[in-house]
């Protein structure tokens, strides 16, 4: 650490509290301006229960990357549907309507990276 400025933040998932996001998924915010030195993006873990989905939505300002850690799902972006699973990275441009379903029998767990960082106000619900 130099002076009063923090140079590094390490946040362990176990220290974060889950909350239900505007799209209906359970979120754990891992890194964002609210809890770290990060200013221009955010990283969160999302969990979607078997047989459920997020609600279709879009972000006027933010682009997103989903990275699937566990489970099986179906991703919809602007009407296109694709099956997704572990180790798949999904690019979601700003303004693109999107939704993800858990099509498996275990929780669908993914990382969500938003740039600029996630804000509830930048989420517009379609459904």
Show where each model-derived region lies.
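Conserved short histidine dyad/triad with adjacent acidic residue
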Residues: 29, 44-59
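A generic "binding-loop/recognition-motif" signal
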Residues: 50, 61-62, 80, 96-97, ...
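Conserved GNAT-family N-acetyltransferase fold
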Residues: 46, 66, 90
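Ligand-binding loop in jelly-roll beta-barrel domains
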Residues: 94-120
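Glycine- and acidic-residue-biased ligand/ion/polar-headgroup-sensing regions
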Residues: 61-63, 68-73
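A short, N-terminal "cap"/entry segment at the start of jelly-roll beta-barrel domains
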Residues: 1-41, 55, 125-127
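Histidine-centered metal-chelating micro-motifs
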Residues: 53-55, 74, 90, 94-100
């Amino acid at each position: 650490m130099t002076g009063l400025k923090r140079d590094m933040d390490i946040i362990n998932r176990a220290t974060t509290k889950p909350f239900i996001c505007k799209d209906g998924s359970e979120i754990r915010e891992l890194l964002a301006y609210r809890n770290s030195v990060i200013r221009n993006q955010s990283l969160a873990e999302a969990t979607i229960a078997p047989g459920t989905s997020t609600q279709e939505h879009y972000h006027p300002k933010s682009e997103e990357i989903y990275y699937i850690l566990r489970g099986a799902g179906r991703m919809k972006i602007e009407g296109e549907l694709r099956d997704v699973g572990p180790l798949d990275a999904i690019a979601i441009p700003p303004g693109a309507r999107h939704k993800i379903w858990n099509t498996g029998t275990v929780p669908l767990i993914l990382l969500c990276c938003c740039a600029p960082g996630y804000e509830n106000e930048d989420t517009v619900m379609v459904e």
